[in-house]
Amino acid sequence: MTENTHAGRLIVLTGPTAVGKGTVEAKLRADHPEVWVSVSATTRAPRPGEVDGVNYWFLTEDEFLAREAAGEFLETAVVHGMAHYGTLLKPVEEHLAAGVPTILEIDLQGARRVKQRAAELDLEVVYVFIAPPSFEELERRLIGRGTETAEQQARRLETAKVELAAESEFDVTIVNETVDQAAADLWSVIAKEYGL
């Protein structure tokens, strides 16, 4: 085991599809610009308004698989049976070493892979689960988003049931009643872990 060069604990943020993870982390970043949120790589097509390098690193499947084979990812997963997602390791390590509050917003598969690799990489991690007030509210949010077909929505809701059942695997649960409250709760976790 190598000497720990990380000055802070990595915050892994997970929750079911359409729970508002991205909205909560955007509010957190607006209120606390000192927080760095890792930009995931993906092979899925950009949604309207998404920008390469800001929302995701949009890669072809060949590019993604080559970087995965080169060991450049902390974790990777195939999500909803459709697209590859992954977290590039080097930027995470650099931000942690600099003491910058660092968040990974990833799905359940990714969080489980980080758990598997954390000891090997000498990472200290806090796992945070963002939960909806109810399954019905989650369904309403997903349908209201209007970015998926009915078939994709049904597949995502089935995945969400599995994700919700895994809540007990996490250190902290934050219920996303409102974005402001959930972002404030997440900041409380970060402030505690980073001594802010």
Curated annotation (Swiss-Prot):
<dbReference type="InterPro" id="IPR008144">
    <property type="entry name" value="Guanylate_kin-like_dom"/>
</dbReference>
<dbReference type="Pfam" id="PF00625">
    <property type="entry name" value="Guanylate_kin"/>
</dbReference>
<dbReference type="InterPro" id="IPR017665">
    <property type="entry name" value="Guanylate_kinase"/>
</dbReference>
<protein>
    <recommendedName>
        <fullName>Guanylate kinase</fullName>
        <ecNumber>2.7.4.8</ecNumber>
    </recommendedName>
</protein>
<keyword id="KW-0547">Nucleotide-binding</keyword>
<dbReference type="GO" id="GO:0004385">
    <property type="term" value="F:guanylate kinase activity"/>
</dbReference>
<dbReference type="InterPro" id="IPR020590">
    <property type="entry name" value="Guanylate_kinase_CS"/>
</dbReference>
<dbReference type="InterPro" id="IPR008145">
    <property type="entry name" value="GK/Ca_channel_bsu"/>
</dbReference>
<comment type="similarity">
    <text>Belongs to the guanylate kinase family.</text>
</comment>
<keyword id="KW-0808">Transferase</keyword>
<dbReference type="InterPro" id="IPR027417">
    <property type="entry name" value="P-loop_NTPase"/>
</dbReference>
<keyword id="KW-0963">Cytoplasm</keyword>
<feature type="domain" description="Guanylate kinase-like">
    <location>
        <begin position="8"/>
        <end position="191"/>
    </location>
</feature>
<comment type="function">
    <text>Essential for recycling GMP and indirectly, cGMP.</text>
</comment>
<feature type="binding site">
    <location>
        <begin position="15"/>
        <end position="22"/>
    </location>
    <ligand>
        <name>ATP</name>
    </ligand>
</feature>
<dbReference type="GO" id="GO:0005829">
    <property type="term" value="C:cytosol"/>
</dbReference>
<keyword id="KW-0418">Kinase</keyword>
<keyword id="KW-0067">ATP-binding</keyword>
<dbReference type="GO" id="GO:0005524">
    <property type="term" value="F:ATP binding"/>
</dbReference>
